[in-house]
Each structure stands twice: as C-alpha cells, then as structure tokens.
Design a protein with these regions (language model features):
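Conserved redox-active cysteine motifs that mediate thiol-disulfide chemistry
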Residues: 74, 82-99
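Thiol/disulfide oxidoreductase modules built on the thioredoxin-like
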Residues: 125-133, 138-189
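Short pre-active-site segment immediately N-terminal to redox-active cysteine/selenocysteine motifs
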Residues: 76-78, 82-86, 152, 162
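Structural microenvironment flanking redox-active thiols in thiol-disulfide oxidoreductases
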Residues: 91-129, 140-146
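Structural recognition of the beta-strand scaffold that forms the well-ordered cores
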Residues: 81, 111-113, 135-137
C-alpha cells in the first residue's frame, strides 16, 4: 500500500512538474516583415471540391466604397483573393497577385477583397504600397469569407466567365510562380 501511494505521488509530481513548464510561443512575423512567397513554403492547398458552384451573391464594397457583388464580373474569368492587412501570407502574396493581374489582364480579372473591418485601415495600408494593377475591395462584415467557408486567409477562388467555381487555393501562393502558372494555364486554356 505504501509503495502504491509513493508511486502515485511520484506520478503526480511528474505531471505537475510538466504543467509548470511553459514554452515561449514563437512570435508570428508582422505582416510588413514577410517577404515575397517562396514557391515551396507558400504552396497553398488546392481544393476542387466546390467546382461548378455559383459565385456567392453577397454584397461588399468596391474600391470607391460603393456596393458591389461578384456577379458584376461575369463575362470574364475572375480570381477573387480574400486577404487582410494583418495576415502575413496575404501581404506576402500581394505583389505576385499584382504581377498576375498585369500579365493576364486580357484573359482574367483579379480582385483582392480585404476582410479587415475598416476602409480607413485598408486605404492607409494600401497607400504605402505601389501596386499597379490591383485595387482594394472591402468586405468588413466578412460575408464573402463566410460564403467561402474556409476560415483561412488568404483564400483565392477562380471563377469561370459564367460565374462557376473552377478551384480555390487555401493558403498563400506565389501567383507568378510555376505552380500558379500551371493551374491558371489549365483553367484558362480550357475556357478559350
């Protein structure tokens, strides 16, 4: 009996000792400290499980603050990127989305929709960058994010000219890298 009690006390001491040790969490880099994504590190997960689904009919703000819906973009394929100013991978992939928007302007519309809660915050962040092609849309209620049902930023969805989903990438991506080029060539080539 004494041996059992000593064994039990020893086990408790080990367990309690383990609970007392707290590891210091590794700090996440600030969004402004993240560099342009490297292909292997920022290879978001390709998801085709929503292929053929219609664009969500939610309303958010265009770059001028007017009400806007994705349905206004039908007629040409559109790549919709959900992002936020505080999201490191989002910020890292933004320059590559800007490059893509310029290179594919004739075949593809690219819009970036911030999930931040303030137009002033997004506009202030945007003013410090020199994007040539992209303009910041805003979904402060996160309605588009909820419609996409990923819970992850960045999330990027490609819709065909009829407004049907082709695929989505959940997580960061180098949008002017070889993987993105292959995905887009297959999708856009099939629509010509």
């Amino acid at each position: 009996m004494r041996l059992e009690i000593l064994g039990l006390l020893g086990s408790c001491a080990v367990l309690l000792g383990g609970c007392d040790k707290q590891s210091t969490p590794t700090p996440q880099p600030k969004a402004d400290e993240v560099s342009t994504p490297a292909e292997p590190e920022q290879a978001g997960k390709l998801d085709i499980s929503h292929r053929g689904e219609a664009m969500p009919s939610v309303v958010f703000e265009d770059p001028n603050g007017a009400k806007f819906s994705l349905s206004e973009l039908r007629g040409k394929p559109v790549l919709v990127n959900l992002w936020a100013t505080w999201c490191g991978p989002c910020v890292a992939e933004m320059p590559t989305l800007d490059t893509l928007a310029g290179c594919e302007a004739e075949r593809l519309q690219v819009i970036v929709v911030s999930q931040d809660n303030s137009r002033a915050l997004v506009d202030g962040w945007w003013a410090k960058r020199s994007f040539k092609q992209l303009k910041p849309y805003l979904d402060s209620k996160n309605d588009l994010g909820f419609a996409f049902e990923t819970g992850v930023l960045p999330t990027t969805v490609l819709y065909d000219a009829e407004g049907k989903e082709v695929w989505r990438v959940v997580g960061g991506m180098n949008w002017d890298g070889p993987r993105a080029n292959t995905l887009l060539a297959e999708a856009l080539g099939a629509q010509q």
